[in-house]
C-alpha cells in the first residue's frame, strides 16, 4: 500500500542554523522509515529514516542513516552521487506527468533534475542548485569507512517550492524517498513507498506515496 502521511508547518525553518535545524526536526517531527527491500537480490537494508516538515517557502527533509559502509567519492554537484552512500527525494511535478529528483550523497554533494524519464531530463544549473540548502554531519571530502567505527551520518535538505514551479506550499505532494549505494560494499536500493517492478528502478512515479502539508 502506498503511504499517505501528514507533515506539519514549521515557520521559517530554512533560516535556522544547522545545529538548531537538527534539534527542531528531531523534537518536532516524526521519522518515516525508508525500509522497503523491493528486490531480493539486494537484501542489505541500512537503518534509514527521513523527517519532514515545511515552511511557507521550502520542503525540509532530514535523513538519518546507519550503515556498515559509508562511501563518499563524488565532490562535484550533478555527478554520479547514486554510486556513493546516497539518499534521494523524488517529487512529482504538480503540473504534469514529469517529476523532480533531488539526490544527495553522504558528504552533501547534490544532483537535481526535472525529468521526463530515467534517461530524459534537464539537470539543474548551478544557480538553481545553490538555492537548495544542504548540509551533512560529515565533512565535504572523500570518505570510505570500511573497517572503521564510523557507521552513522545525517544529511539535511531544504527544497524551495519555487523550484517545483510553486508560489507557495501546496496541499500535498506525491513523492518517494530512497537510499542507495551502487558502489558500496553491499549495494542496496531501499524505498519509502514500495515499488512493484522486477529490477531496481526509482524512476517510477506510479509508485509514489503522498505527503499532505497541514497548514494549521
Where are these regions (language model features)?
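Structural preference for beta-rich elements and adjacent junctions enriched in aromatics
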Residues: 1-216
Amino acid at each position: 500500500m502506498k503511504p499517505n502521511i501528514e507533515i506539519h508547518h514549521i515557520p521559517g525553518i530554512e533560516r535556522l542554523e544547522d545545529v538548531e535545524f537538527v534539534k527542531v526536526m528531531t523534537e518536532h517531527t516524526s521519522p518515516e522509515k525508508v525500509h522497503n527491500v523491493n528486490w531480493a537480490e539486494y537484501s542489505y537494508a541500512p537503518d534509514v529514516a527521513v523527517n519532514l516538515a515545511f515552511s511557507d517557502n521550502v520542503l525540509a527533509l532530514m535523513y538519518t542513516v546507519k550503515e556498515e559502509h559509508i562511501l563518499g567519492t563524488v565532490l562535484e554537484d550533478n555527478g554520479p552521487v547514486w554510486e556513493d552512500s546516497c539518499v534521494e527525494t523524488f517529487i512529482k511535478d504538480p503540473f504534469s506527468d514529469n517529476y523532480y529528483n533531488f539526490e544527495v550523497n553522504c558528504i552533501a554533494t547534490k544532483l537535481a533534475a526535472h525529468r521526463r524519464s530515467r534517461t530524459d531530463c534537464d539537470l539543474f544549473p548551478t544557480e538553481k542548485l545553490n538555492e537548495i540548502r544542504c548540509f551533512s554531519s560529515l565533512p565535504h571530502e572523500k570518505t570510505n569507512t570500511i573497517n572503521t567505527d564510523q557507521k552513522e551520518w545525517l544529511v539535511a535538505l531544504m527544497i524551495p517550492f519555487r523550484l517545483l514551479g510553486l508560489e507557495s506550499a501546496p496541499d500535498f505532494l506525491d513523492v518517494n524517498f530512497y537510499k542507495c549505494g551502487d558502489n558500496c560494499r553491499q549495494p542496496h536500493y531501499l524505498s519509502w513507498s514500495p515499488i512493484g517492478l522486477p529490477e531496481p528502478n526509482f524512476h517510477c512515479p506510479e509508485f509514489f506515496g503522498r505527503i499532505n502539508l497541514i497548514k494549521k
